[in-house]
């Protein structure tokens, strides 16, 4: 489902002494089946923005269009139930979303809540657990017995159990070690590529953004500053420096080499893959020179 924000403002506690405008004239487009990252400093409006995607928040003005549904300030809660099945939300530290006595019961909760029979929910729980790389042995275990990485997988399985078209993730790898982060991000990318799930990632890890996102929305003080490819965002040092956005370590290394005369012949590499491709071209050119 395509996502459109048109002139969206959001105000917390309007018409009170504590009124605060969190989003200002937000216009953006997220293509169906794409992998979009949302970045920005703390307080830039990231969390407020993603809460509009399943109607947890409604625009103070403007509209959010998701598929055929248009969300405005006047939309009724009864009109949002189908949307909330189609848009899965995984918040920061998703293990805090685990509440049932067993992994199976936790994953079954969503499908049953949306009207699925207990028998079918059991089948869905097994399928969802398999998708996140865990076997049936985990079904009868307490979520509290699991490691941090396993808890993240179970929480993700619970969201996937309702078969969302859109998956919104708020810092899904926060607190995990390097291996755990890689496993979770590869799993999320796999969902996008194999099941055509639209992925919307909020992250402070610019490495994750550079490695996995196809496009980036940069927010500052509730406004969209730029929407572009990761390469265009991270190669624009004027914007990243002004807004205090860290660049990926690969780009930092590339900038260091650029200052010392290395010609990258175009945009700077932003991740390990693009840097390795650059090195490969250099070696191929040297081989040709030797042959000549």
From Swiss-Prot:
An annotated Gene Ontology molecular function: ATP binding
CDD domains: ABC_cobalt_CbiO_domain1
Gene3D superfamilies xrefs: P-loop containing nucleotide triphosphate hydrolases (3.40.50.300)
Main location, first listed in the record: membrane
Keyword tags: ATP-binding, Cell membrane, Membrane, Nucleotide-binding, Translocase, Transport
Family per similarity comment: Belongs to the ABC transporter superfamily. Energy-coupling factor EcfA family.
Species, as recorded: Oenococcus oeni (strain ATCC BAA-331 / PSU-1)
Annotated GO CC locations: ATP-binding cassette (ABC) transporter complex
Top-level taxon of the source organism: Bacteria
Residues noted as binding ATP in the record, renumbered to the chain: 40-47
Enzyme Commission number, as recorded: 7.-.-.-
Enzyme superclass (EC): translocase
Membrane topology, as annotated: Peripheral membrane protein
Protein name: Energy-coupling factor transporter ATP-binding protein EcfA2
Pfam families reported for this sequence: ABC_tran
Disulfide bonds: none
Purpose: ATP-binding (A) component of a common energy-coupling factor (ECF) ABC-transporter complex. Unlike classic ABC transporters this ECF transporter provides the energy necessary to transport a number of different substrates.
Residue ranges of domain ABC transporter in the record: 3-246
UniProt-annotated location(s): Cell membrane
Subunit structure: Forms a stable energy-coupling factor (ECF) transporter complex composed of 2 membrane-embedded substrate-binding proteins (S component), 2 ATP-binding proteins (A component) and 2 transmembrane proteins (T component).
């Amino acid at each position: 489902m395509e996502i459109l924000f048109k002139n969206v403002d959001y105000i917390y506690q309007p018409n009170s002494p504590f009124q605060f405008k969190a989003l200002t004239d937000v216009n953006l487009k997220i293509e169906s089946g794409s992998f979009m990252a949302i970045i920005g400093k703390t307080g830039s409006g990231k969390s407020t923005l993603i809460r509009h995607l399943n109607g947890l928040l409604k625009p103070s003005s403007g509209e959010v269009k998701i598929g055929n549904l248009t969300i405005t300030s006047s939309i009724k809660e009864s009109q949002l139930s189908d949307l909330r099945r189609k848009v899965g939300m995984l918040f920061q530290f998703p293990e805090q979303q685990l509440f049932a006595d067993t992994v199976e019961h936790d994953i079954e909760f969503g499908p049953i809540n949306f009207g699925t029979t207990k028998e079918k929910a059991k089948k869905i729980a097994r399928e969802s657990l398999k998708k996140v790389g865990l076997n049936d042995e985990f079904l009868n275990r307490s979520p509290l017995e699991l490691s941090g990485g396993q808890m993240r997988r179970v929480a993700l399985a619970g969201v996937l159990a309702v078969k969302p078209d859109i998956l919104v993730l708020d810092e899904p790898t926060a607190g995990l070690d390097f291996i755990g982060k890689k496993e979770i991000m590869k799993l999320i990318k796999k969902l996008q590529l194999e099941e055509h799930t639209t992925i919307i990632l909020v992250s402070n890890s610019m490495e994750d953004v550079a490695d996995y996102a196809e496009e980036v929305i940069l927010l500052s003080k509730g406004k969209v500053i730029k929407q572009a490819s990761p390469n265009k965002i991270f190669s624009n040092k004027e914007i990243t420096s002004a807004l205090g956005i860290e660049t990926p370590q690969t780009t930092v290394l590339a900038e260091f080499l650029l200052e010392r005369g290395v010609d990258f012949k175009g945009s700077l590499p932003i991740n390990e893959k693009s840097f390795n491709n650059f090195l490969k071209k250099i070696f191929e050119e040297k081989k040709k020179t030797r042959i000549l």
